[in-house]
Amino acid sequence: MASLLLAAISAATSTYASNTGANSADSTDAPTARFDYSLSAITEGQWNMTTGRGAWANRLDASLGIGLWRGARLEAGILSTWQPTDYIAEVCQDFSNINAPNRPLRLVHFGLQQHFIDNKLGVFVGLRQADEDYFNTPMAGLSTGASCGCVPTVNDNFHINVFPLTALGLHITYTPTPQWLVQTTLYNGNAYDTLDRSFRFRPHADGVINLGSVSYTREGAHADDFSATYLVGWNFGNHYREATQHRHSQVGFWATVEQPLAKVGRVGLAAAATVSHQFEDPEVAVGYWNGTLAANNLTRRGGTLALVLNRAYYNDAHETDTELTFAMPLGQYFTLQPAIHHYSTSGHKQWLGQLRVTVSL
């Protein structure tokens, strides 16, 4: 796997192409958007400081977009994960958002994207991961933990298509202005990571999952400023529950606020909070909230320091994850990110550490 990562990075750096973003609505009419790609690799060392155990996790993502007729694009994305060691912590909320079973190749994104009405309305049909579109506000990306990538009330109560799984679905977006985004998605109720199952759409057997959100984002005055984001999202799921041998419907919501606070010289300060709740007899997670304090541009090269507090409530447990992390860019393509987590799971405490290197092309 290590040689695969190096070979992919080497091949990408030796080939020039304009990367306009596979899911950018503005790219559909631009001449340079006829063909574009992206490639990213993450390698992470992990250490359970309470037990002394160590681990190593790796993730490789690649995407490709090909312009077709006006406003239409064919999109594809693959994912590879490699973890030669066992998991080092038994926690409810995973401390690393790249932990996944070993699989050299997953097709996680494949379908047709079509834009209408001057790119204000977008429709995608095909394979897709929910965390491409939801739970991905700017400050959520500061954390290395899994809960900020998908709230536990959604991730733990459904077999949903978030990393590393995918599902067949219909995704619709509407952007009446650059600040407002309304989106909703209907997925197959069971997500998979193998090609022979991923393209299934079986509402009678697997049920369905619907996610949606309405958000308003106000960009900062400069490119490196924190942006303000206000979001409300919902989920509905109807699936077969093994414990009761019957179909079960659940509904829930989540809300996120990300707010710049002040700027001291070049350093920006911001705060964020998310809350979620699940109704109708959730099987695993009932409620969740988090809070984040962050400061960016701490050095002349950049650098963002974040303190993140996650609190999750389960039917048979409760857990708090406190994370301190610092993401430091090293040139144009590399980012170094150490992180320390303190977990308290129904009174059981442990310390976990990570050192992550990300390469993005």
Where are the language model's segments positioned?
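Transmembrane beta-barrel strands of outer-membrane/channel proteins
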Residues: 37-45, 74-80, 123-129, 184-188, ...
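Loop-centered beta-sheet repeat module
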Residues: 173-240
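Detector for outer-membrane/organellar transmembrane beta-barrel domains
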Residues: 217-314
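Membrane-embedded beta-strands of outer-membrane beta-barrel proteins
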Residues: 62, 110, 170, 212-214, ...
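Outer-membrane beta-barrel "beta-signal"
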Residues: 349-361
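Repeated loop/turn-to-beta-strand initiation elements of outer-membrane beta-barrel proteins
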Residues: 35, 70-74, 119-123, 179-184, ...
